[in-house]
């Protein structure tokens, strides 16, 4: 989870994730929407890939990036577990 927290700590990486909510995109298309250098974008994409938040797939000479939805489900579950949210035993529900 430390890798995920580090990846999410940067506002540019969060902006990349918001852009990718619209769907799969090339690095060039992402770069067109951000005021950062392409080399900087590449570093941010690598951090997001290392955290398993983004999946990169080569299509010919182009690499396309998309959100790794399964990873977000795992992250949300881990945070909910950490906070004790959603645990029926904790809520005291009788049934």
Each model region followed by its residue ranges:
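Alpha-helical residues within the helix-turn-helix
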Residues: 32, 43, 49-50
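Amphipathic alpha-helical dimerization/coiled-coil segments
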Residues: 69-95
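Core alpha-helical elements of the protein kinase catalytic domain
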Residues: 45-46, 87
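Extended rod-forming repeat segments used as scaffolds/tethers
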Residues: 17, 51, 79-80
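N-terminal helix-turn-helix DNA-binding core of bacterial DNA-binding proteins
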Residues: 2-37, 59-72
